[in-house]
A protein has these predicted regions:
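Glycine-rich phosphate-binding loops of nucleotide-dependent enzymes
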Residues: 1-73
Length: 73
């Protein structure tokens, strides 16, 4: 997806969630979108859960930083 398509998808997901009071399970690799629209995030590495929490908790989790960026905070 292009950047504008990712933004449009995020807006659509948020709109549907709010309009119909839905819980949405999103499996996605566009992390900026995930962090922008999610209340809770589960981070996985090789099929194993390595962290769960709010977007801000996930962004500062040492296991997530190591797995996704290859370094320490």
């Amino acid at each position: 997806l292009t950047h504008s398509e990712v933004d449009e998808l995020a807006d659509t997901i948020v709109s549907l969630r709010e309009k119909f009071k839905l819980t949405i399970l999103l499996v996605e690799h566009h992390m900026s979108m995930v962090m922008k629209i999610s209340d809770q995030v589960v981070a996985m590495e090789f099929g194993r859960k390595i962290a769960e929490g709010t977007p801000s908790q996930i962004q500062s989790d040492e296991n997530v930083v190591r797995a996704y960026l290859g370094g320490d905070i």
